Curated annotation (Swiss-Prot):
Component of the archaeal exosome complex. Forms a hexameric ring-like arrangement composed of 3 Rrp41-Rrp42 heterodimers. The hexameric ring associates with a trimer of Rrp4 and/or Csl4 subunits. This is Exosome complex component Rrp42. InterPro entries: ExoRNase_PH_dom1, ExoRNase_PH_dom2, ExoRNase_PH_dom2_sf, Exosome_comp_Rrp42_subfam, PNPase/RNase_PH_dom_sf, Ribosomal_Su5_D2-typ_SF, Rrp42_archaea. Keywords: Cytoplasm, Exosome. It comes from Aeropyrum pernix (strain ATCC 700893 / DSM 11879 / JCM 9820 / NBRC 100138 / K1). The gene is rrp42.
Amino acid sequence: MSITPHRLPVAPVIVREAYLSLLRKGWRPGDRDLKTPRNVKIETGIIEKAEGSALVKLGKTQVIAGVKAGVGAPFKDTPNQGVLTVHAEFVPLASPVFEPGPPDENAIELARVVDRSLREVGAVDLESLVIRPGEKVWVLWVDLYIIDHDGNLFDASMLATMAVLLTARLPRYEESETGEIIISKEGEGEELKVKTRVVTVTTAKIDRYIVVDPNIEEEAVSDVRLVTAVDENGRIVGLQKTGMGSLTEADIETMIGYSLEASKVYFKALEEAIKP
């Protein structure tokens, strides 16, 4: 079942003032400075029946990702490419504000930001997913499950997605005399071909202060957030603004600068997670 979150509660003025008093000193809860993301832990191979799976802990935020592969037809406009789709579910146990129901704009936005980031850099070699050109290709479904929401779902979900793609293996298959593709349940097939790695880094503006990787309370007191997609070569490949506040040119430059630095932390965590 898909899950939809309700609107997060507005933080009381006293909470915002408490955060501002810390920010004026250059600090945040958890002994972080403004530019430092929370601790990142990535565990792969947690779901036996998935082609790839991972659990990401970004502070107290936890996201599980899994990828399954099936055989299907390619899109008519891309007959020589496989198919990759991303879906996100907000599990009710993750937050008291999440309730059962169809995905709303927040879940859809999360999945689309992850999906667009992958497509912008051509993260997965979709041509390598072709089984029979124009007829049969691998269809990959990446499912994201938010199981503990303590802020910054974008970065945790993007890390989880990259972790599963980097460790996934396609199933083995055989082709029958009639042309039917038969997937074998025994043994592992080829590794998924990932051409480029990409992460997102979320920054938030609270009054005049810019912070990296906001927790749930910082999100509640923030005026606006910017999600910056960065590839492994340090290129900015996507931007997504959320929230009703405004950003100056100087704000955006600061946010991008912070994001480029923080992305190095995320890429290092990914590299450590996929080491044999």
